[in-house]
Structure formats: structure tokens, C-alpha cells
Swiss-Prot record:
Protein source organism: Parafrankia sp. (strain EAN1pec)
Top-rank taxon, per record: Bacteria
Glutamine amidotransferase type-1 domain ranges (all copies): 20-210
Residue ranges constituting the GMPS ATP-PPase domain according to the UniProt record: 211-408
Designated name of the protein: GMP synthase [glutamine-hydrolyzing]
Length: 534
């Protein structure tokens, strides 16, 4: 791990009571998934770049290291390398896929281009249970994705598993606490992958499973109190789970010194504005300012069809409305002899990773609160910035938030405006809102609302489709049904919904939603498509 310029990863600077497991990222699509799986074993984890110097890694006092997979071959020009000093530091290490190979190469094993690649589900034969496979079946399905293979383990290692095409599918040196697997234990297709990770963390590395929701809540409350003291705070509620959980957590820490501003832009799904005003306040007791600005946003969006322009307009208006509310609240606070000094932000750990934010992170643009004037600059309070989405949901449950808020599916900041392909008008909003309500109701009735990452309706407002309804020829709008499964929204697959469910959704939409005479199902994955249409 050299001193070359490296990718910017945001350091969370949090949880000093935990010695983290550091996931060293070699450019893997699964790096975040590995970190999440570690946390599912109740062990705290963070992601760092592959070229972080060894001294900097060790300064973080890691309990263990996991070397991720990556898209390169170890023989590619400029391929990431590992400083062998890392393996002499006495820290337990697990190499996964590319990490397995780069460990072997650094410690004088052999990595070869065998000409036989493995992709997808593969049968693994356990030849020696060792630490990783102790108590597990001798034959199990694993998920492979590699071209090169380790053909000889480094000196001092013993081979513990193989496949028909990979003679060294796993190895270990328990004396030095070094382990490697060619497969991906973090993906669900590896049948006993979580057991392998758990064995490494709890047995091989001796980590303590102390990363629990109760501890997270207690620690976050303490941290917020220490940061803000007696200061006053403001939070922009979007109606989504992130801002709701952030506000609820801060409310528990500081009570009535927090005021939440809910900017209702008129672009939410059916019943959401009422739910925020009723259920969120009832469950938290938070001081809520509900700004009803639907007419203002509708006027600003009139005649606009370009999706980027929609986003910019909505972001601009959101900032202006929030700014006006913040000024009013700050003036009221000053009249009482206080001042609003803090802004609560629902930043999550993936945002920190992707933005490379330092500890004082910038406001997320998709939360539509960025770009506030100089005289309204607040110190940021980001109580969720070390958490993944699934952890935020569990935290919301721990805080007693209503299930409908905690398990609300991801929703774009511009709301239904980007689910109308064409100009946004009040009439079209009612159409897509009604269609979306039918879709979500049927998915909920089918018991699939937690299995599907996102499901929604899109209105093709600039398209007219010919149809026959009541023996009359019609020209109505087509509605697109979009349903995807995903782990983290970085990639997504279209959901294989049952035909009878698709039929019920289609029948209800064309019969209950005016001006719609056709429903189509989008079967595009991400990539090449995106989850949203705009």
C-alpha cells in the first residue's frame, strides 16, 4: 500500500469505543455489501481504499481486515498491490476473491491465468474444515466471479477447500490468523457464506459482537448531546425514512430544542403528508412546522418537461421555502434569547463513502437543503452517517417509529414529478398518485412490500394509447409498472411478480384511475437502465 494519490473515502470519525473491521476496497462492487454483512454479525466495520498506507491502517486499531474483491487481474498493469508488511502486523486478515489472490501473491504463493474462469454458482468441496468451515457441510454452493486462480498456497498456509476448476479455493494460516477464500461469502448465493464470515470474525479474529441497536442508540444520543449542548436545532423533513429516523434520534437526545420543518411540495405519494403530520408527531412528540407549498411548486414547474430542469427547479424552490422557514424560526428563537445553530441531516454511510466527505460533510443535494445563504450556515448534526439503510430501518424500529414510516420504500427527492414523463400538472399528479396507490396496495396485500426494493407507477403523460372501454374507442395514458429487487440500489433486477398479481394491478388501474387505458411492465435491470425513469 503505497503513498500514491488515492480515492477519497469519508472517515466517519465515530465510534471510538469500537475497534473496527476495515474492509480494504480494491474497487469491488460488493465492498459495501461486505461491510454490511460484517455489521450483521454485530461487529462494527468501515471501508478504506486499497492504497491507504499500512501505518494509517494500523493507526485505526483495526480488530481485523478484509481484502475485498476487485475488477482487475493481479497481472494487469497498475493492478492494486498489498504491502506485505500488512500481513506481518499481527492483525487478522481475510482475503476475498481478488483479495485472496493478492494475499497469495504478496506472501509468495502462486496466482495463475489457468484459462478456466468461474462465474456464478459453483460447488465447493471442503477438504479441511479449519477455522472458516468448522461444522459446515463438506459440499456447499458458493458464488464465484474470477478468471485468475491461486494454484499454490503461500508457505505456511494449508489449503482447506477446492472446486473442480480451482485447486486452492480457500486457505488459512491460523497461527498468523491469515485466511483467504476465492468465492464471495457476502452474497446470498453462497449458501453458508455468513457462517464463513462469522467464523472469521468471531473465531479467527476474536471480535466481540457488540454492535447492536441498543448500543447504537445510546452512543448516538450521547454524541448528539455532547455536540449541541443547549443549542437549538432545525431539521428538514422530507417524508422519507432517513430524515425521520435522524429527527427521532435527535429528539430523543435533546427534546424540544429541535424543530422539524416539513416542506410539503405537493409531490408526495397518497397519504404521505398526512402521515408525517399525524403519525410522526404522535410517535416522537417533535415540534413540527408544516409548510404547504404545493401551489408554489406547481407554478414553478408549469411548462417544464426536461427531467434535469424539474430537479433543479424543485431543489431551488425547496431551498427557498426552507430558508424562509429557517429565518422565521431563527427570528423567533432570537426573540426568546436563543439561536438556531445546528441543522440535522440524514446522511448515511454510503453517502460518506461516495462523496469522500470529511467529518464536516456537505449537505446531500438530493435532500434538497444544499446551498443555504451565508447567514443561515449551521453546524451539521449527522447522527446516521455511520449507518447503512438497513441499519437505519432497524434503528427506527428501536426508536418506536411507525412501521409505515420505517419501512417506506426509497422515494426520489423530486417526488412524483420525475414519475411523470412530461409536464407536471395537478391533473397528472392525481393520475400518477392514484395509480401508484393501487400498485402499492396490491403489493402490500400480496405480502411483497418488504421483499421488493422499490415498486411504483410511472405516467407516460406525453403518450396517448388507443383502447376500448365500454364499447367506445379511447385515447388514454399508458402507465408503466416498475418493480425491482436490490440490496443497495447500486444494481437492481426487475422483480418477477406473479402473473395473477400483475393482472390484479392492471385491472384495478385501468378501472379505478381515470384517463388510463393501458398498463405495461418494465423488465429492465440496472444496469443498463436506472431504477427511476427520470
Amino acid at each position: 500500500m503505497n503513498e500514491s494519490p488515492r480515492a477519497s473515502y469519508g472517515s466517519t470519525g465515530a465510534h471510538p469505543g469500537y475497534d473496527p473491521v476495515l474492509v480494504i476496497d480494491f474497487g469491488a462492487q460488493y465492498a459495501q455489501l461486505i461491510a454490511r454483512r460484517v455489521r450483521e454479525c454485530h461487529v462494527y466495520s468501515e471501508i478504506v481504499p486499497w492504497d491507504m498506507p499500512v501505518a494509517e491502517i494500523l493507526a485505526r486499531r483495526p480488530a481485523a481486515l478484509i481484502l475485498s474483491g476487485g475488477p482487475k487481474s493481479v497481472y494487469s498493469p497498475g493492478a492494486p498491490r498489498v504491502d506485505p508488511a500488512l500481513f506481518a502486523a499481527g492483525v487478522p486478515v481475510l482475503g476475498i476473491c481478488y483479495g485472496h489472490q493478492v494475499m497469495a501473491q504478496a506472501l509468495d504463493g502462486t496466482v495463475a491465468r489457468t484459462g478456466t474462469a468461474e462465474y456464478g454458482a459453483t460447488r465447493l468441496r471442503v477438504d479441511d474444515p479449519g477455522v472458516l468451515f468448522d461444522g459446515l457441510p463438506t459440499s456447499q454452493q458458493v458464488w464465484m466471479s474470477h478468471g485468475d486462480s491461486v494454484t499454490a498456497a503461500p508457505p505456511g498456509f494449508r489449503v482447506t477447500a477446492s472446486t473442480p476448476s480451482t485447486p486452492v479455493a480457500a486457505f488459512e494460516d491460523p497461527t498468523r490468523r491469515l485466511y483467504g477464500v476465492q468465492f464471495h461469502p457476502e452474497v446470498v448465493h453462497s449458501e453458508r457464506g455468513m457462517d464463513v464470515l462469522r467464523h472469521f470474525l468471531l473465531v479467527g479474529a476474536g471480535c466481540r459482537p457488540s454492535w447492536t441497536m441498543i448500543n447504537i442508540v445510546e452512543e448516538a444520543v450521547t454524541a448528539v448531546r455532547a455536540q449541541v449542548g443547549n443549542g437549538r436545532l432545525i431539521c428538514g423533513l422530507s417524508g422519507g425514512v432517513d430524515s425521520a429516523v435522524a429527527a427521532a434520534l435527535v429528539q430523543r437526545a435533546v427534546g424540544d430544542t429541535l424543530t422539524c420543518v416539513f416542506v410539503d411540495h405537493g409531490l408526495l405519494r397518497a397519504g404521505e403528508a398526512e402521515q408525517v403530520e399525524r403519525d410522526f408527531v404522535a410517535s416522537t412528540g417533535v415540534d413540527l412546522v408544516h409548510v404547504k407549498a404545493a401551489d408554489r411548486f406547481a407554478s414553478a414547474l408549469a411548462g417544464v418537461t426536461d427531467p434535469e430542469q424539474k430537479r433543479k427547479i424543485i431543489g431551488r424552490e425547496f431551498i427557498r421555502v426552507f430558508e424562509e422557514s429557517a429565518r422565521e424560526l431563527d427570528a423567533r428563537a432570537e426573540a426568546e434569547g436563543t439561536h438556531i445553530g445546528f441543522l440535522v441531516q440524514g446522511t448515511l454511510y454510503p453517502d460518506v463513502i461516495e462523496s469522500g466527505s470529511p467529518t464536516a460533510a456537505k449537505i446531500k443535494s438530493h435532500h434538497n437543503v444544499g446551498g443555504l445563504p451565508d447567514d443561515l450556515q449551521f453546524d451539521l448534526v449527522e447522527p446516521l452517517r455511520t449507518l447503512f439503510k438497513d441499519e437505519v430501518r432497524r434503528l427506527g424500529e428501536e426508536l418506536g417509529l411507525p412501521e409505515d414510516i420505517v419501512w417506506r420504500q426509497p422515494f426520489p427527492g423530486p417526488g412524483l414529478a420525475v414519475r411523470i414523463i412530461g409536464e407536471v400538472t395537478p391533473e397528472r399528479l392525481e393520475i400518477v398518485r392514484a395509480a401508484d396507490a393501487v400498485v402499492r396496495d396490491e403489493i402490500r396485500r400480496a405480502g411483497l412490500d418488504r421483499e421488493i426494493w422499490q415498486v411504483f407507477a410511472v405516467l407516460l403523460a406525453d403518450v396517448r394509447s388507443v383502447g376500448v372501454q365500454g364499447d367506445e374507442r379511447t385515447y388514454g395514458f399508458p402507465v408503466v409498472l416498475r418493480a425491482v429487487t436490490s440490496e443497495d440500489a447500486m444494481t437492481a433486477d426487475w422483480a418477477r411478480l406473479p402473473y395473477d398479481l400483475l393482472e390484479r394491478i392492471s385491472n384495478r388501474v385501468v378501472n379505478e384511475v381515470g384517463q388510463v387505458n393501458r398498463v405495461v411492465y418494465d423488465i429492465t435491470s440496472k444496469p443498463p437502465g436506472t431504477i427511476e425513469w427520470e
